[in-house]
């Protein structure tokens, strides 16, 4: 891991409701870049099926990137829950796993940038630099929102002809899409969600905070929420009919709602799962459509080997 975005040339935007953004971003990146990862079934470290030579970039905007994210990365790679790491409440075996994870991360080609006030020029420059020097295949931007640098940049470009938030964010979204295409990288960008969306249980582009113009340019749009009581009631017949989960746990605690899938056959899909926030272990449970009716989807395996993407 070095301090300082499936297919290439795409950009994906995922909206969620708390610091899950950063954890999901790091989990996605480490699944591609870490040479070894903890296997929960085998209870051991295994070689990353995606290979050992992939590289990626994380651009953070609201944390002391290294200090605050380091324990999260240890937890993801080792499978040891982050609270246990921070509280130093570890067994001897868990301590050994943490030490192994630290060594693995030293050999991981994941680069971290911290810029809470980025503009479009910075994104082009930074991502191009890492593409040229480190051949990155994926970028995670955590997260997108209006800031003074973006506003100033847009004002100069438009000669102060009036500045609206939706215009600035639309320009940002268009440029992120162009970056993905021209630099041949997969970009996953995160936003916050609106309070109104939480109250109204919106699970589509209406949940995107800042501007509805943002989803216009993305290839894949996802909203992530913990299921509400009302949603759990809607899927209760499904829960009653299946036997899945961790032990006796069958109730999902996370739902990924796909509100956009450009060029894809499957649209308006909800993936229900169980997410351990301590180490980001995730178990897919089942899928439904927007009417909360269960549907079957054939799995597709995506691998990134030596920065080349294949599917099966």
Where are the model-predicted features located?
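Glycine-rich nucleotide-phosphate-binding loops and adjacent flexible coil segments
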Residues: 2-190, 196-197, 206, 257
């Amino acid at each position: 891991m070095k301090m300082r975005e499936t297919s290439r040339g795409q950009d994906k935007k995922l909206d969620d409701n708390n610091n899950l953004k950063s954890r999901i971003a790091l989990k996605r990146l480490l699944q591609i870049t870490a040479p070894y990862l903890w296997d929960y079934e085998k209870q051991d470290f295994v070689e990353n099926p995606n290979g050992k030579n992939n590289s990626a970039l994380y651009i953070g905007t609201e944390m002391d990137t290294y200090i605050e994210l380091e324990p999260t990365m240890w937890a993801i790679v080792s499978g040891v829950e982050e609270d246990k790491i921070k509280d130093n409440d570890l067994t001897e075996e868990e301590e050994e796993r943490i030490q192994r994870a630290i060594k693995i991360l030293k050999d991981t080609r994941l680069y971290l940038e911290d810029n809470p006030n980025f503009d479009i020029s910075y994104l082009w420059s930074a991502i191009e630099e890492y593409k040229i020097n480190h051949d990155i295949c994926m970028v995670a931007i955590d997260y997108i929102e209006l800031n003074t640098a973006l506003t100033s940049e847009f004002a100069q470009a438009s000669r102060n002809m009036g500045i609206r938030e939706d215009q600035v964010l639309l320009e940002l979204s268009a440029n992120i899409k162009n970056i993905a295409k021209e630099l041949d990288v997969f970009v996953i960008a995160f936003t916050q969600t609106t309070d109104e969306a939480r109250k109204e249980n919106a699970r589509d582009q209406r949940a995107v905070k800042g501007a509805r113009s943002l989803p216009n340019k993305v290839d894949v749009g996802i909203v992530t929420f913990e299921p509400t009581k009302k949603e759990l009631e809607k899927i209760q017949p499904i829960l009653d009919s299946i036997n899945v989960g961790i032990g006796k746990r069958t109730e999902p605690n996370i739902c990924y709602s796909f509100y956009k899938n450009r060029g894809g056959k499957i649209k308006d899909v909800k993936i229900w799962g169980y997410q351990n926030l301590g180490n980001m272990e995730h178990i897919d449970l089942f899928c439904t459509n927007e009417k909360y009716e269960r549907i079957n989807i054939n799995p597709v395996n995506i691998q990134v080997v030596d920065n080349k993407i294949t599917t099966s």
